[in-house]
């Protein structure tokens, strides 16, 4: 077993306590369930992936699928910790978010042996670093928006069927989920717009062109349009519920195909 696999498995195990926390009987203890165990599990779940991701990119950026996924997991954990500290209901998204991140971590571990090319290009390093940082933040924000949207969908369905489950009793109320979804989508749209702008700047430095009609660009623009359309529709007609959830998940799927999806094809299938 290679050293990298061992490190990746260690980062994966660091996510396990946080992933099982919502399903453990102690989840109802402490301040609204946010006990010392909860915060300790979140810190561990952030520290493991973050340390491993920083080790892989130390000195220079690698564009491999596994590295990108670990960076994304660390960013999502950090954002979730901040939201849990600043709001009353965000921590209740943990039954949906944390097992999902554990699954992504398992996939990152399986992809550890895939090629991890180093970023090269003619653009100044600051522009490349800025573009990568903005892309990671965008994906983390939209991940949280998709989770909040899924929570609202599950709650709405349980209310209509009058059959709540232990999961829906744990999740935030519909209004809280939709409020978080809207705020996260607004932030995602702003940061994604900045990401498209920095991407154009990097491409201009490298090729002299502002746009390139590749899969990543087209899917990113499509995500920007879908999110913008949803925000506009919400402002004008108050669209919400299942329709809003579907549009958010479509935007998340498009952005997933644009970032991890393209890396999966180039690094794993074609690598």
From Swiss-Prot:
Supply the InterPro entries for this chain. Cyt_c_assembly (IPR002541), YpjD/HemX (IPR052372)
GO MF annotation terms: heme binding
- Which GO biological process categories is it annotated with? cytochrome complex assembly
List, alphabetically, the Pfam families matched: Cytochrom_C_asm
This protein's GO cellular component annotations are: plasma membrane
Reading the lineage from the top rank, the first entry is: Bacteria
Signal peptide span: none
- Please give the PANTHER family that the UniProt record associates with this protein: INNER MEMBRANE PROTEIN YPJD (PTHR38034:SF1)
Please report the name of this protein according to its UniProt entry. Uncharacterized 28.8 kDa protein in nifR3-like 5'region
Its source organism is Azospirillum brasilense
């Amino acid at each position: 077993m290679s050293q990298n696999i061992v490190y990746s498995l260690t980062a994966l195990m660091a996510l396990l306590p946080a992933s099982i926390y919502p399903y453990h009987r102690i989840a109802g203890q402490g301040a609204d369930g946010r006990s010392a165990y909860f915060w300790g599990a979140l810190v561990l779940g952030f520290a493991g992936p973050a340390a491993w991701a920083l080790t892989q990119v130390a000195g220079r950026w690698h564009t491999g699928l596994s590295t990108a996924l670990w960076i994304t997991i660390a960013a999502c954990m950090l954002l979730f910790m901040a939201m849990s500290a600043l709001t009353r209901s965000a921590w209740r998204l943990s039954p949906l978010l944390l097992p999902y991140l554990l699954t992504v971590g398992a996939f990152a571990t399986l992809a550890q042996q895939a090629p991890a090319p180093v970023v090269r290009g003619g653009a100044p390093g600051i522009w490349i670093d800025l573009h990568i940082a903005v892309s990671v933040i965008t994906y983390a924000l939209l991940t949280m928006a998709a989770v909040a949207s899924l929570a609202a969908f599950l709650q709405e369905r349980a209310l209509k069927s009058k059959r709540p489950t232990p999961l829906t009793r744990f999740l935030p109320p519909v209004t809280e989920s939709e409020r978080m979804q809207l705020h996260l989508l607004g932030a995602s749209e702003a940061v994604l717009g900045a990401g498209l702008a920095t991407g154009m700047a990097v491409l201009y430095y490298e090729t002299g062109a502002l746009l390139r009609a590749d899969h990543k660009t087209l899917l990113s623009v499509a995500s920007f349009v879908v999110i913008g359309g949803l925000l506009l529709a919400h402002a004008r007609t108050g669209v919400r519920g299942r329709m809003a959830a579907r549009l958010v998940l479509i935007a998340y799927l498009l952005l997933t195909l644009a970032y991890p999806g393209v890396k999966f094809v180039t690094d794993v299938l074609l690598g």
